Amino acid sequence: MIRFLRFTLVVSFVFATAFSRPLCRAAAAAGDDDAVLQADHAFVQALAKADAAAASKFLDAEFSWTDSAGATQSRAEVLKSFPKPVLGDESDAEVKERTYGDVGTVMAARGKVHVLRVWVKRPAGWRALVYHEVTQLDQPPTAAGSGVNDCENPCKTVPFQPKNEAERAIIAAWQALETGVTAHDAEAWSLHVADEFVQISSNNDHPIDKAGRIATINKQKQSGAGSAPPPLVSAHMLDFGDAVVMICLHQPYTGKPIHVTRVWIKRDGKWIMSISFQTTIQAAPAKAG
């Protein structure tokens, strides 16, 4: 399910629209949207008040926090000293929520600053799995693409061993869409992406939806610009039925590495990408061209 709201209206809006919200074809149990939003709101308020005791109750065992500089901390590291959330209490932020079965996602934004929080349904309730910040560029990027025409990694091989059929299918879908990007084949790319797809990158100045990404691929085709994606360095998948969270490290052909959180969903029998948040790791050395 997909919903759009501001936190200042969470409680009243949730119940006022409980029977009128639009549906995603990915299954979501009745009430899960409300439960995700309520947990998320309480978590954000605890963070804004620097209430570590309250905030810690929401953290999943696999929790990770990535800030706008690309620094990532584990649950244990966060518990030692909670980071300061870039959007504060988010009272003036635009918030979008989507629930995919046992995975809930909340995206908050104010201007160029974006935050993704991924929630997972555990026996004890909804728990925060990922907190990922992105601060976008003030101006459009100067490069039209990577400038590279050949794609070995990730199009043909990846340094990752899937542990089950779902992960194998996701890798195959991902390789197919990245092959489409490299070949400037927008149709091939679009087959593996959800209609509600969004990409938020610290290497761009605005969010990119499905139509926007297709337009970029077509422009690169017209110009002949090399557009091979950045090779994968490492990946970790967390499986939750018909939704999988994929956390990756990429090293572009030039520049600094990128921390990426992707959400994959199984819809109409196939795996497609729904969300991609990408943050450059500022403290890492840059690769020379």
Language-model segments: which ranges?
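A short gly/proline-enriched turn/hairpin at secondary-structure junctions
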Residues: L59-Q73, K84-L87, E196-I208, K219-S223
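Positively charged n-region of N-terminal signal peptides that target proteins for export
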Residues: M1-F7
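Bacterial N-terminal signal peptides
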Residues: T8-R21
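Short, low-complexity N-terminal intrinsically disordered segments enriched in polar/charged residues
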Residues: L23-A61, L129, T135-L191, D195, ...
